[in-house]
């Protein structure tokens, strides 16, 4: 099995030993404690689950290094992981504290931290980290606003994680740690594993994005990996996505070839930098290949200049742990009038691919009208109509017309999966450079 990033084995921070877990939970109730920001539980859950592997929340120097260069002061690769508080009045002079969950009633203890440093983060440092990650400091950007709405006091130190916030309780059939996914991959006997990141239900286009690389790579299986944290207004709620994806997988894929899972993290809408982070997660969970869309899922505002976006392939290849990654383009659809399977088998990318973006989901679902079969499988459409709240806006995309000039030349940009456009898709091979971590 492919090795985790920069290590021979995962380093989850969750306390798995039952006796130690009980002992630590009891101790935590007597420790000074702070209720952390709403972002904190997602980050601690990801560290506890083994999706990324810093020893805990970072000091400012390491967070700045991770934001600017994706490396820490010791040269290891990581993303920025900060615990930002409004103040430290509740901590006092304590060196060991309990971190409490703001997102669960009663604020249960998430983790225990051994404090190494308490530092003020300057406005300039916040601006640098914001710009490096999101490529904008516009407060209309949901990720920028969330990051900057936290306090300015960074508390750093190693942590021991005691629970996964609400994710495990609310999504018991879907939430999986990186450790659990690796174990399931081993149980299946898979050696070549394709991962697909999604914040949407899986429609015909998404289905084909999974099917084509599985066939061309002769992969053993695909792991559909859903975001279970916060999205933006208008995105489909996690329970609806879960039902739609499971139905699609059960009906339209061979048995024992699709693993439907989820993880407790928010969508950051951070463009190419988020692509690197998502690939990091997938390698740690055991995927050898990762399906990634052409355009970065970034938050568009009126004040962000419409300049060409950087190549996420370049971002990923320059990341220290992905220096020898590879990418191959795949066509998605030939003609909307053709069955997707026929289009895929035809192997031609000269068909009609003009996209039409239509905000008609609200009206169609409200009237009980299913989306076109070229867009969505009838079973998936029925679930969306049955379960999606009437007020939920759904963006439907289906395809007709001719390709744009130049699309046939396959200028592929590697970016975070989610904004999956029809003209191109890349499959990043994470196995070829695994020996370098």
Swiss-Prot record:
SUPFAM superfamilies: Nucleotidylyl transferase, PUA domain-like. The keyword Protein biosynthesis does not apply. GO terms for molecular function: ATP binding; sulfate adenylyltransferase (ATP) activity. Residues 303-322 are annotated as: Disordered. InterPro entries: ATP-Sase_PUA-like_dom (IPR025980), PUA-like_sf (IPR015947), Rossmann-like_a/b/a_fold (IPR014729), SO4_adenylyltransferase_pro (IPR020792), Sulfurylase_cat_dom (IPR024951), Sulphate_adenylyltransferase (IPR002650). It holds the Pfam family PUA_2. GO terms for biological process: hydrogen sulfide biosynthetic process; sulfate assimilation. It is an enzyme of class 2 (transferase). Belongs to the sulfate adenylyltransferase family. This is Sulfate adenylyltransferase. It comes from Riftia pachyptila sulfur-oxidizing endosymbiont.
